[in-house]
Amino acid sequence: MAAVLFALLALALLRAGGASAAAGTVTTSVQSGDSWVQLTCTLNTSAAGVTGHRWLKGKEVVKEDQLQGLHTEHNVTGDDRFGKYSCLFLPKDTGEATLTVDGPPRIKAVKKSEHANEGDSVTLLCKSESFPFVTAWVWYKVADSGDQVIQNGSQSRFFISHSEAQSELHIKDLDLTSDPGEYACNGTSLQGTDAAVVTLRVRSRLAALWPFLGIVAEVLVLVTVIFIYEKRRKPDEVLDDEDAGAAPLKSSGHHVNDDKGKNVRQRNAS
């Protein structure tokens, strides 16, 4: 008896789940032009009332409304229209569907120029903003004699790591002569290929010391100027002191002569 009741309960749950799934069925449509895409989702039936719609690109919400219709659209223009989208009918679990907009890969350098010191390590980074995802990454150094493909682990200094969305080139123990230049990252997907360029500049080990040496030189020049100025000023001060000391002696001599003259006149008068 218990087994029969369990079977009936399971059957009821399956029917309820099937009814719910049927109620949440969503049909999708993707229409595109040269630079635009129109995404459409239609909820066929719904046991519960729709309170709104939400559109996502990946995990980012790009549009949301509180309309109650069983139909929703999202229009996208520009180069960033490619990717994976989702439409959701609210409240949650009312209905949901996924739409994809395929396009050629668009490879971008996170930083178009990198600066590092000789002997240090540096990381060059490229990312892909496209769908389908990049399936193959290649790094090479741009040269007049021909592009040089960089293999992972080559010279024990070049290491490459990548995922579907980005690729990194790690260079260790930078060489001032051979490492500076332009590095290109190439990404290929089912829709095509694209590349971006990163310029690497390597500074000498002494480059960081130049500002400090400049400050030291300025201080030395200033000290030298002050020393010369003080040395030239001291003889003038000594001469001024000697002149000031001789003046009182000359004045006292005049007083002595005046006193002698008075005594002579007094004697003559007597």
From Swiss-Prot:
Any one GO cellular component localisation term in the record: plasma membrane
This protein's record includes keyword Phosphoprotein: yes
Domain Ig-like C2-type: 22-103
Cytoplasmic side: 229-270
Location of region: Disordered: 239-270
Membrane-protein topology: Single-pass type I membrane protein
Protein's recorded name: Basigin
Source organism of this protein record: Oryctolagus cuniculus
Gene name per UniProt: BSG
